[in-house]
Design a protein with these regions (language model features):
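Long, internal low-complexity/basic segments
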Residues: 18-24, 31, 36, 60, ...
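Active-site regions of oxyanion-processing enzymes, predominantly non-cytosolic
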Residues: 19-25, 78, 139-201, 236-247, ...
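A short beta-strand-to-alpha-helix junction
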Residues: 22, 42-48, 65-70, 99-107, ...
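Active-site segment of extracytoplasmic enzymes that catalyze sulfate/phosphate-ester chemistry
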Residues: 28, 35-108, 113, 119
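Histidine-centered active-site microenvironments of extracellular/periplasmic hydrolases
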Residues: 46, 236-290, 307-311, 328-329, ...
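Polar, surface-exposed loop/tail segments
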Residues: 49, 78, 126, 131-141, ...
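A long, amphipathic alpha-helix that forms part
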Residues: 191-244, 301
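C-terminal cap/loop subdomain of S1 sulfatases and analogous C-terminal strand-loop tails that border
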Residues: 295, 302-402
Length: 486
């Protein structure tokens, strides 16, 4: 059973400092593997009162998107306020072997900037026990000393703090339906979500395994909501809440066949809520923002100058210029090589598949260990999937370009790239994406050196007690495809 020991510690820690600092405390609540399935975002099947309250007492952003739909590139981008493709941190879990990645130029992680300004920096929650920090998952070399600890209780009297609370989120359900999680939900939340009541996207079959997994995922959202309430309750108990800006967001969407790792809204659209002094109450912002904007916004709220190299923007600034588009990138995930880019406006999404000769569901041990993916592959082999699911998930190749009218097609199932009526939109977004790749110095335009790939794969092959037969097969397949230009 998963434990969030550090979060419990957050609740039990004594109120160390009665006097509040003049500068606001900054708290990021960052959740793993979760889309915007909260009632304040329109989810009907479950109730999430604590996140809803946070939104009611603050500002909810309805169109927040991550620049990477998988943990480590997303978190590398977030902690620097830069696109992961600009800083060379775009491949998932890269730089973990003998070959390392260093940040370019003057770029430094945000905690360094907070420390220089006198803030106590800490990262707790999931993975934080004893002196161990909460989840970081950065794809570059960084200094442990940029964090003073894993809980704000260690700060000096009157010292403001920058705290990240990492929550397990969608990962609580594991790789598939399991009784341990379901029993824990029933014990702590009183009841489980009914799989029969689940509403799935149109491209997922209403199979019992897939329905149960989605119900378990919604219970992860409910449990996350409870944990958010626990964090806020401690701030209130210690009389810190009135001088603390609390941000709530997730690192990408639900882990599913078209969610995590992919650039559809299922993988990139995330909740983003902020509450605190000076923040508009009960407000909803419908303009497009990127998750790296959190970094610049937080620095500005703390009275810290936002560095010129930072690509995120202060979305609360009086002179803030709203984005007309947001961008995202998918590159290698674990052993699976990939290169996809996207640009999204209010109405349209353009996706460029640079490795379109490969299937959508490429072999990937992490993905293929999931019960839902195994079930989808079984149904595909038995020819029991409908035409839409077959086309979207199991076509042997993909279109080089995808274009979706999100107003008419929110699930992104009708590709308009070849439609003459949308030629002007296609060309405009194609150009916009190319300009972004050039202006931001997208490092994904150059293939990852095979030496770096091999260095990281040694880590994968050497870790844990898993049978690596499938992983070795996938690595060799990826190398073969790369040699063939596929």
């Amino acid at each position: 059973m998963y434990r969030l020991a550090a979060l419990v510690g957050l609740l039990l820690a004594p109120a160390a400092h009665a006097a509040e600092p003049a500068r606001p405390n900054i708290v990021w609540i960052v959740v793993d593997d979760m889309s915007a399935n909260f009632s304040c975002y329109g989810e009907k099947l479950i109730r999430t009162p604590h996140v809803d309250k946070l939104a009611a007492e603050g500002t909810r952003f309805s169109k927040a998107f991550v620049t990477a739909p998988v943990c480590s590139p997303c978190r590398s981008a977030l902690i620097t306020g830069c696109y992961q493709t600009t800083i060379g941190a775009h491949h998932h879990r890269s730089g973990r072997g003998e070959l390392k990645i260093t940040l370019p130029g003057d770029v430094v992680p945000a905690p360094v900037l907070f420390q220089k300004a006198g803030y106590y920096t800490c990262i707790g929650g999931f993975q934080a026990t004893g002196d161990k920090l909460g989840k970081t998952d950065y794809n570059f070399e960084w200094d442990r000393t940029m964090y003073d600890g894993n809980d704000w209780a260690g700060r000096k009297p009157g010292q403001p703090f920058f705290m990240q609370v990492q929550l397990h989120g969608g990962k609580y359900r594991g790789q598939g339906p399991n009784a341990n999680w379901q029993n824990r939900v029933k014990k702590e939340l009183g009841a489980n979500t009914d799989p029969a009541a689940v509403v799935l996207p149109p491209y997922y079959p209403r199979d019992p395994v897939i329905l149960q997994d989605w119900a378990d995922y919604l219970d992860c959202c409910r449990y996350t909501d409870k944990e958010v309430g626990d964090v806020v309750a401690r701030l209130e108990k210690e009389k810190l809440l009135d001088n603390t800006v609390v941000f709530f967001m997730t690192d990408h969407g639900i882990s599913h066949a078209r969610g995590k790792q992919f650039l559809y809204d299922e993988g990139t659209h995330v909740p983003f809520v902020v509450r605190g002094p000076g923040i508009a109450k009960g407000a909803t912002r419908d303009d497009l923002i990127e998750h790296i904007d959190l970094t610049a916004t937080s620095l500005a709220l703390a009275g810290i100058d936002v560095p010129k190299w930072m690509q995120g923007r202060n979305v609360l600034a009086k002179d803030y210029a709203k984005r007309d588009a947001v961008f995202a990138a998918r590159d290698r995930c674990d052993e699976t090589m990939e290169h996809i880019r996207s640009v999204r406006t209010d109405r349209f999404k353009y996706i460029r598949n640079y490795m379109n000769q490969r299937p959508h569901l490429q072999p990937c041990r992490y993905k293929d260990e999931k019960a839902i993916v195994q079930k989808l592959r079984d149904l595909h082999a038995a020819k029991k999937l409908d035409d839409l699911t077959e086309k979207l998930l199991f076509a042997e190749t993909r279109p080089a370009e995808e274009l979706y009218d999100l107003a008419a097609d929110p699930h992104e199932v009708t590709n308009l790239a070849a439609d003459p009526k949308h030629k002007a939109t296609l060309e405009a977004l194609r150009k916009k994406l190319a300009e972004w790749e050039e202006s931001t110095g997208d490092r994904g335009r150059t293939p990852e050196p095979m030496a770096m790939y091999d260095s990281d794969m040694k880590v994968y092959l050497g870790g844990g007690k898993k049978d690596n037969t499938e992983l070795k097969r996938n690595i060799e397949l990826n190398k073969t495809w790369a040699k063939e230009g596929k």
